[in-house]
Swiss-Prot record:
<comment type="similarity">
    <text>Belongs to the XhoI type II restriction endonuclease family.</text>
</comment>
<feature type="compositionally biased region" description="Basic and acidic residues">
    <location>
        <begin position="22"/>
        <end position="42"/>
    </location>
</feature>
<protein>
    <recommendedName>
        <fullName>Type II restriction enzyme AbrI</fullName>
        <ecNumber>3.1.21.4</ecNumber>
    </recommendedName>
</protein>
<dbReference type="GO" id="GO:0003677">
    <property type="term" value="F:DNA binding"/>
</dbReference>
<keyword id="KW-0255">Endonuclease</keyword>
<keyword id="KW-0540">Nuclease</keyword>
<feature type="region of interest" description="Disordered">
    <location>
        <begin position="161"/>
        <end position="222"/>
    </location>
</feature>
<feature type="compositionally biased region" description="Low complexity">
    <location>
        <begin position="188"/>
        <end position="202"/>
    </location>
</feature>
<dbReference type="Pfam" id="PF04555">
    <property type="entry name" value="XhoI"/>
</dbReference>
<keyword id="KW-0378">Hydrolase</keyword>
<dbReference type="GO" id="GO:0009036">
    <property type="term" value="F:type II site-specific deoxyribonuclease activity"/>
</dbReference>
<feature type="region of interest" description="Disordered">
    <location>
        <begin position="21"/>
        <end position="45"/>
    </location>
</feature>
<dbReference type="InterPro" id="IPR007636">
    <property type="entry name" value="Restrct_endonuc_II_XhoI"/>
</dbReference>
<keyword id="KW-0680">Restriction system</keyword>
<dbReference type="GO" id="GO:0009307">
    <property type="term" value="P:DNA restriction-modification system"/>
</dbReference>
Length: 222
C-alpha cells in the first residue's frame, strides 16, 4: 500500500516559514529583555520545529494509526537506553503498549556548520546505536522493530554547502566524506530514516554569524 504523505510539500513549506518566524520572534524578545546573546533555549528550539512535528503526526494519522498514542509532552518522551539509562525523544508513537516510532527534530543554522556537523553526526549515530542495542536486549518487549526517525532542517547557506578540507595524517579519509559538502551528504544515517532538508534564510530576517523499518519522507522543494 502506498504511503499517504498528507500534502507534505505544502505543509513543509509552511513549517519552514514558521521556523524562521519563530526564531525571529525569539530574537526580538531577547533584544527587548537585554539579553541578545542568550542563544536558543531548548523550549524555543522545540517550538521552532512544531510545524514539522505536526506534519509527521498528520502522516501517521493518514496511514491508519488512528488509535496510536502520540506523545509530545516532556514527561512522556523518555525511553530506556542501553549505554545510557534513558533518552529523551521529541515524539513517540505507541500503540497497544508497543513502541511504533521514535523521532528527533533538529535544526542547524550558521555559523559553525563544520563543528556542528560532527556533533550532529555523533549524536545521530550514537542515539540510533543505543536504541537498537536496547531493542535487541528486550528493553521494549516482544514488539516489531520500531521506526526511528531523525529529521534535520539545515540553512541553505554558502558555509553549509562548502566541501570540507579534512585531512587524516595516518589513514585516507573515505571517498564519501571527501565528495560531499558539509551537510550535502547527510541524507541517511544509522537512525533508519533520516533526511536533511535545506532551507534558505528569509531575506527579511537579519543574518547571524547557519535496520529499521524502511521508509522516508522526501525532502521538500522549498
Amino acid at each position: 500500500m502506498a504511503l499517504e504523505l498528507a500534502d507534505y510539500e505544502r505543509k513543509a513549506r509552511e513549517s519552514v516559514m514558521a521556523f524562521w518566524g519563530n526564531r525571529e520572534k525569539a530574537r526580538q524578545k531577547q533584544q527587548e529583555s537585554g539579553k541578545p546573546d542568550q542563544g536558543e533555549r531548548r523550549r524555543d528550539r522545540r517550538k521552532n520545529m512544531d510545524g514539522f512535528c505536526a506534519l509527521v503526526i498528520d502522516i501517521i494519522r493518514a496511514n491508519g494509526l488512528h488509535r496510536a498514542e502520540i506523545h509530545q509532552k516532556r514527561a512522556l518522551l523518555t525511553l530506556p537506553g542501553y549505554f545510557r539509562p534513558t533518552k529523551l525523544w521529541d515524539l513517540l508513537v505507541i500503540q497497544d503498549r508497543r513502541l511504533v516510532a521514535a523521532l528527533e527534530f533538529k535544526s542547524q543554522v550558521g555559523p559553525s556548520f563544520g563543528n556542528n556537523f560532527n556533533n550532529r553526526t555523533e549524536e545521530a549515530i550514537g542515539t540510533a546505536h543505543d536504541l537498537w542495542t536496547a531493542y535487541r536486549e528486550g528493553a521494549f518487549g516482544q514488539s516489531p522493530r520500531p521506526f526511528v526517525g531523525w529529521l534535520m532542517l539545515v540553512e541553505d547557506a554558502p558555509e553549509s554547502n562548502q566541501r570540507r578540507a579534512d585531512t587524516s595524517p595516518h589513514f585516507r579519509c573515505s571517498r564519501s566524506s571527501r565528495a560531499h559538502p558539509t551537510y550535502g551528504g547527510m541524507t541517511s544515517s544509522a537512525s533508519g530514516s533520516s533526511r536533511s532538508s535545506f532551507t534558505p534564510r528569509p531575506r527579511s530576517s537579519p543574518r547571524r554569524a547557519p535496520p529499521p523499518r524502511q521508509g522516508r519522507i522526501p525532502s521538500p522543494r522549498i
